[in-house]
Regions:
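Residue-level detector of extended alpha-helical repeat arrays and alpha-solenoid scaffolds
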Residues: 65, 87, 106-109, 169
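Conserved hydrophobic register position within alpha-solenoid helical repeats
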Residues: 68-72, 109, 113, 143, ...
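HEAT-repeat alpha-solenoid elements in large eukaryotic scaffold proteins
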Residues: 22-32, 62-75, 113, 125-134
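Alpha-helical solenoid scaffolds in eukaryotic proteins
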Residues: 47-56, 88-97, 152-159
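Alpha-solenoid helical repeat architecture
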Residues: 57-61, 98-102, 161-162
Length: 181
């Protein structure tokens, strides 16, 4: 005759051996810790909050992701055309998020990448005021680095253009046009 177990039921979650459906097999944003966020600047000062915002986009519900992306946009591409020191470091993570099926605001991420690719505010200002180029913190260099970071991943455009979601495909087509210049 068997006796009933005297062990208490566990309140711990079981260890999940496979990722949830629709989630990439590799964890997104694993390289975030390699960037010295506290040592670089966004529009608010220290860029230390950027990893939290990127994680909010990656793992938050639709409203959380949308809010995090809007806050991130204000920090790295203020007004839709003024890039910051942290912008170039953030771009590879935006490309990564734009390709993850579970991320709810992918078209808006692609639109942000296009805004960064189009950014020429600091270059235009420096053309009129060359002294801007003599500053220790040179925003023209940031702007060029950010545009180059977007261009560096243009090989990912084909995969995004093949998406069934028409909003993603349209945003990707606009980004592709911006990168073809």
């Amino acid at each position: 005759m068997r006796s009933a177990s005297t062990e208490q039921p566990s309140s711990e979650r079981p260890v999940r051996r496979t990722p949830p459906t629709g989630v990439a097999r590799t964890t997104p944003l694993t390289a975030l810790s390699r960037v010295p966020w506290a040592d670089i600047q966004d529009s608010t000062g220290s860029a230390a909050a950027i990893p939290l915002l990127l994680n909010g986009i990656a793992w938050g519900d639709a409203e959380t992701a949308r809010s995090a992306l809007e806050d991130l946009r204000k920090r790295i591409c203020q007004y839709g055309f003024v890039v910051e020191q942290a912008t170039a470091a953030t771009v590879p993570f935006l490309w990564e998020l734009a390709q993850l099926p579970h991320v709810s605001c992918r078209p808006q991420i692609i639109q942000l990448l296009k805004a960064i690719a189009d950014a020429r505010q600091w270059e235009c200002t420096a053309a009129a005021y060359p002294k801007l180029l003599n500053r220790r913190e040179n925003p023209v260099v940031w702007e060029r680095a950010a545009r180059q970071a977007v261009r560096a991943r243009r090989g990912d455009l084909g995969r995004l253009m093949a998406e069934q979601d028409t909003e993603i495909a349209r945003a990707t087509s606009e980004l592709a046009r911006a990168l073809s210049d």
